Amino acid sequence: MATKFATGSSKGDNSFEVGKNAAQQAMEGLSGAEPSLALVFCSSVYDYDEVVKGVRSLTKDTVLVGSSSAGAFTEKGVAPKSVVVGLISTDTYKVHAGIGTGLRESPAKAVEEALKGIPTTIEGYPHISAIILQDGLAGKGEETSLMTAATFGQEAHLFGGAAGDELEFKATTVICNDKCLEDAVSICVIHSKRPLLGGVKHGHKA
């Protein structure tokens, strides 16, 4: 099975329906393939818990990570004050995720909590990548990355970023499966048969 990636975006007044609509668009883009990972980026104007419920009404128990945002985009363009969902379907990845709290006080403990129970190696999937999404107001980006790298080694590829809140700088939230928390870090670990590649910047104009 080839790896497929599809996106959807939606906005509106009902947080559950907005999440569901964005997920529905992404599901249609997979053309019937089952999702292996859901990525959700949600404007702070929405109720995060309701958005996640809407997404998971379609993706079910698929591993889900995400965060609040200060603007999002898909390949179709910029999507301000919206919910954006990306779905990956693949048989060449093994995906796990966890969330750790108390990031401000102890990044080490938060990362340890997030990674608890996640295997460091999986036979047949030699490459390791991690998507690190953290409370953008905690100010612990460097520490969080270093702690994750220390767990998986120098060969691990690290991606991710900090949660936003439409530039209000009041509260930022990260998401892991059905949990939406502040002062936390959400980490998705991907073991893959081939290395994952990262990109910097995008093709959209301001």
What are these regions (language model features)?
Residues M1-A206:
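Cofactor- and metal-binding active-site motifs of prokaryotic enzymes
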